[in-house]
């Protein structure tokens, strides 16, 4: 079961800084993994022993089998990385208190403008409206509190400068309304606007300007880590759909903002309209940054890991990075100053099937 051990399977054989130590012997056997190997072996044998109309069909079947086997192995590796990276989120939630906040951010799928009544021809060739969601989570008196910051961005590219300015806006708002917050932990997916040297290195300046120290920044594996943003996005889309069904049109960013804030808005969500201008920046080169998934910041520099808590990591002092980052200047106007909303109570425990029947 060596491929079940995160310290062993996720270690880098070439770089000792990203190599974990494991004292296990890895002499156990996983029955499900062995069953999978047996099924794949029997399937390959059946293909080789089967009769085909021509040699080309047999080679095509074997090629399809090899591609499917490779996809299964990649999916298994993905599951291991997903679980290991999710441990970063769990550890952060366990250490949250009044002075710490976890921020999960993601670009929602662009909203396609909608009219209350529109023809079939008007449905096509639409230009979507960009909107960004940041969910703030903190713990107060042993209860988790959540709040969503929604930025409707008009005429702006979803790039690193835009993300940096939105991050600073959220942290500055939190610091102004909750001065007790001292540090923040960020979590996002591997989109290029997040997983860029400009965005990551700008965290130092964001911390100084906002007054909240960005202590840690983690990237989730695909489809594993931004569910909080997706849940708020689904609720808001339904809210906008109801607004359109009442006879309103949502064609511009201003109308989209009006839809999100209609009838008191969405509980626990705050909406801001962002006017984006052209950006200017100096790209900072960081070789191999696409393979780094965990970043821990300090006053001296940043320590990075390829997999969460695998190896001692590699430290980069701030002096190693040359160039200056120029953020995108946006016109921000925050509406709906709602307080934090408490998370709903946990669902009731599932009953045993025998007790139901």
Identify the residue ranges that each predicted region occupies.
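Extended mixed-charge, aromatic/glycine-enriched low-complexity segments
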Residues: 1-357
């Amino acid at each position: 079961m060596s491929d079940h051990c995160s310290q062993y399977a996720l270690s880098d054989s070439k770089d000792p800084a990203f190599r974990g130590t494991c004292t296990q012997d890895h002499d156990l056997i996983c029955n499900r993994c062995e069953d999978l190997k047996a099924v794949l072996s029997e399937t390959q044998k059946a293909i080789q022993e089967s009769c085909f109309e021509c040699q080309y069909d047999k080679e095509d079947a074997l090629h399809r089998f090899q591609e499917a086997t490779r996809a299964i192995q990649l999916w298994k590796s993905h599951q291991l990385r997903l679980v290991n990276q999710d441990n970063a989120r769990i550890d952060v939630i366990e250490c949250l208190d009044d002075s710490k906040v976890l921020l999960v951010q993601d670009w929602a799928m662009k909203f396609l403008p909608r009219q209350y009544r529109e023809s079939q021809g008007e449905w096509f060739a639409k230009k979507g409206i960009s909107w960004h969601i940041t969910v703030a989570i903190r713990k107060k008196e042993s209860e988790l509190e959540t709040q969503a910051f929604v930025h409707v961005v008009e005429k702006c590219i979803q790039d690193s400068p835009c993300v940096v300015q939105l991050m600073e806006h959220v942290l500055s708002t939190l610091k102004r309304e909750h001065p007790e917050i001292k540090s923040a932990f960020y979590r996002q997916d591997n989109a290029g606007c997040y997983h860029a040297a400009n965005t990551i290195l700008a965290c130092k300046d964001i911390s100084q300007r906002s007054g909240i120290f960005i202590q840690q920044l983690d990237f989730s594996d695909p489809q594993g880590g931004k569910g909080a943003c997706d849940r708020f996005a689904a609720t808001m889309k339904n809210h906008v759909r109801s607004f359109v069904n009442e006879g309103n049109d949502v064609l511009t960013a201003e109308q989209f903002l009006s839809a999100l804030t209609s009838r008191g808005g969405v509980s626990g969500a705050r909406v801001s309209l962002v006017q984006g201008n052209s950006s200017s920046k100096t790209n900072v080169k960081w070789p191999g940054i696409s393979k780094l998934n965990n970043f821990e910041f300090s006053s001296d520099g940043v320590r990075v890991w390829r997999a969460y808590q695998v190896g001692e990591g590699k430290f980069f002092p701030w002096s190693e990075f040359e160039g200056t980052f120029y953020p995108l200047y946006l016109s921000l106007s925050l509406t709906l100053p709602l307080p934090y909303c408490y998370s709903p109570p946990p669902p009731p425990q599932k009953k045993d099937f025998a007790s139901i029947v």
